[in-house]
Each structure stands twice: as C-alpha cells, then as structure tokens.
C-alpha cells in the first residue's frame, strides 16, 4: 500500500516476495487498547527522540494539517490517553477496506501481527494502468480513513520510546520482546539488514520480529504470505 506518510521502504532483501507488490506499512492483543508505555529493560540507550511524549508527537502531526476528521478524532483521544482502542483502529481499517471495495477492487486482505498492527497484504502485479490506479486509490482511501491512525498506532506498539532513528526503534522493539540477545546493537542490525544474502542472527519470518520491523517503517514480505486478488 502506498498511503503511509512516515514509513521508509526497507532494503529489498533476497527473501522479499517475488511477483507481488510490496505494500505500505504497518500484532493480536487481548485487551481493547494498546498504550505507549516505555520499558526500562529494553537494552537500548539514549538516542534522539521524535518528541518528549506521544501527546507532543501527535500534536506535531496535527499541526501539519491535512488530517481527515475521522482520524483526527482518534488522534485526539490518543493525545489524552496514550492509546488507540482496538475498536477505533479496526474501524479505521474497515473504512479503508470499504472505500477500496467501493472503487471496484475484488478484495482487500489484511495481515495482523502479534501486536495488533494491521497491514494490507501484497497483490499480484497488475498492468501499468492498474498499478497506477491502485496507487492513487490506495492513497486517497488511506489519507481519508487510516494513514495517520496507522502511523500513530505503529509508534505506540513498535516505538513507545519515540526514537527518531528507525533502526534504533526496531532494535529497541526486538529487545523489549526478547527476540535478540541483550548485547545486540543498532550497528549490527544495520549491517545485517543491509546485506543481500538475507542472513540475520534472528528469524526474519517470526511474526513478532516482523511486527517490530513493520511498525517502524520497514516492509518485509515473503512468497508464502497471503495475497489479495484486486482485479
């Protein structure tokens, strides 16, 4: 999907799915909401922050304008509570899906990661005209219903310490979920993730690992992932 406003496309590892498009970014919790509480045992140190608090960061986003009213209501709640409820988050994605269906797409499939984060599944490559139309439609529906909510939700579940450096945010997430050794560093992550052979010291197909990556703007897909049939 092409609507994410702050995500950065990951380096195309050799493991990335072939013959399908790579969508924008992006976990199942049992509670009705997720909160932006930091862990003091994440194994990370220092680092420039996006803002002093989630509330301040959301305020910065809202000050830039161009946020649809339905999403602004959800973001205003996040400013005061530090969370986005599961019901609000799923409603935003439901509205996006319906918007795309109304534009004539056969189906919109979502992948759910262990933290509750959703991303749209990849799809088989269409014609140049089809892909151009999809990009425009996805951006339009995303901007209207879910793009800003997605970015904030990703911060809450994947980067509660608000690190400005995406790699540091990923490593912090991996530490918090005990997915890498305590001595695993950002430098090591950057070296492994920029490689072309797909070799890493952790399981890249682990859904918790992928949740850490996707919530922080890295988009990783595999040939075995579910795909949607758009046309």
Language model: regions and residue ranges:
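Mitochondrial intermembrane space
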Residues: 3-6, 16, 21-231
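Repetitive helical segments and hydrophobic/amphipathic motifs
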Residues: 11-14
